[in-house]
Amino acid sequence: MELQQKTKTDTNGLIPPYGGELKNLIIKDKNLKNDLISKATYEFECSERNACDVELLMVGAFSPLEGFMDEKNYNSVIKNNRNSNGLLFGLPIVFDSNNEKVKAGETILLTYKKQKIAVLEVSSKWEPDKSLEAELCYGTNSLDHPAVKMIFNERGRFYIGGRVYGFELPIRQFPCKTPEEVRSTLPSNHDVVAFQCRNPIHRAHYELFTNALLSDNVSSNSVVLVHPTCGPTQQDDIPGKVRYLTYKELEEEISDERIKWAFLPYSMHMAGPREALQHMIIRRNYGCTHFIIGRDMAGCKSSATGEDFYGPYDAQNFANKCSDELMMQTVPSKNLVYTKEKGYITAEEAKEFNYEIMKLSGTEFRKKLRNGEPIPEWFAFKSVVDVLRNS
């Protein structure tokens, strides 16, 4: 654990980045950039998932990593949840390819939609045991799990590890603040609670993350960082651009100084407990001290049977085990319901006082959305509904 930062805050009064230093892999020297490009042995076009990982490496969101994991670190992470230096890590960060010729010592120019974003200096190339990776990281080999399907059907035959030299961030339809930029907006010496989501935010979500600021383990005058992922998710999820527009509309509508907004170019794996750990590491690098953990966080169902791959509290329990070492606290999400008498309260309180609970299922919501039917404002913000309908 030698790399684990000992102090509570960095020089700006914020929690230190994971491993003690926020990595910035972007090369500013134009001559060095041109030299790296001219000497590159290969040029590979990144998938959208690859591009997300390259960007998060470049800006330090995956600190303390300075590039894609080599075979030693990959094996350590999938087997032990730790890299070879002993630091906790949830999922391996690797670059995949079907190129048989690439070897250690060579360099690869990485492009995304023809934009030259980075050079990868190859230190390791191997053919992974994908069945083992799937079983250890996702708890299953079933292709009904979206990430397992991705590993076998989308990723290349080989994994490549090595140092990344960044040039420029991928041009996106929506701006994603870097950890350094987010940290500059956070208050010193106050708790910062992270809220992760991958879908449009509705009333229950809002009540959830604002109530989190009142939790016993969260200090007064704290803020919440609403930090949605806008990279690839599941096939049936709403596209990232549309999600981004709903968040921007809601940010303007709420206009609450306790709530900070930023967007994360992260590719979801739906890995349950492992992904909860990954999200906590990333959010610590963005300056967060607390992380809201909901029921079945980053979970998914079998596309064949409809059964959950993880238990409802697997992610919560695993995150709690890791929290002390990560220097981050978890904030369990309350089971909130909307009642006719009291508005949003806990399900336990509603049951105790026999209040009338109002319900609207996701299926019913989507049907009303398609048919132009009124959607109750206790369920969804009008601004969010308008964006979803217009898209």
Region annotations inferred by a language model:
Residues E2-S391:
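Active-site cores that bind ATP or allylic diphosphates and position pyrophosphate for catalysis
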